[in-house]
Amino acid sequence: MTSQPIGTISQPVGTSGAASTRIDQRALRVVHESATAIDLAAAERAAAELLSALGIDCDTPSTRDTPARMARAYAELVTPRAFDATTFPNDEGYDELVLARAIPVRSLCEHHMLPFTGVAHVGYLPSRHAILGLSKLARIVEHFACRPQVQERLTTQIADWLNTHLDPRGVGVVIEAEHTCMTLRGVQAVGSTTVTSTMLGTLRDDPRSRAEFIALTGIQR
């Protein structure tokens, strides 16, 4: 993952009577190295070989294009979209929790290359300096989920990114997900979900702040 600063944008707001107030917003371009490393033609050939090795006939009307579809599908699952992580100065001095609940999560278990899906609850206690554009919390979740993953690492990567780039007083991330490597194969534990959490700063050290975060996520304890 690469974060490229793209400068400060000054945006005038308000036009009634007095001089316009100016808000300085900062944007960080976030890209992922794998976006340029995918060889679809090679992936299609490999998919065809895999299906053939599994005894699947790829020469029927229904399966003739399956290797190409597989290659495109997996490419989409491991290619996050670049985005601008826009932050704004915390001019209002807001010091309470900012929480986005039930952000959709879809990723690939790196052990079996089978999907896991669920929701992420992501929150932070702003510093006096910066707050993040609300939609960017979902973008950050997508960014780290679009690659072969394990849920534990995904949870900590989201929290660490926020902690590094926002310098907040606290960060909390909880992910609830169902893993098809558990529901479709092996133990076949249909309906089982896995919950992981990472708490940093005040949300880790202060029991009341931690309890408030957990309560607001709606996680059943």
Label every PLM stretch briefly.
Residues 1-221:
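A domain-level signal for the structural core that forms small-molecule/cofactor-binding pockets
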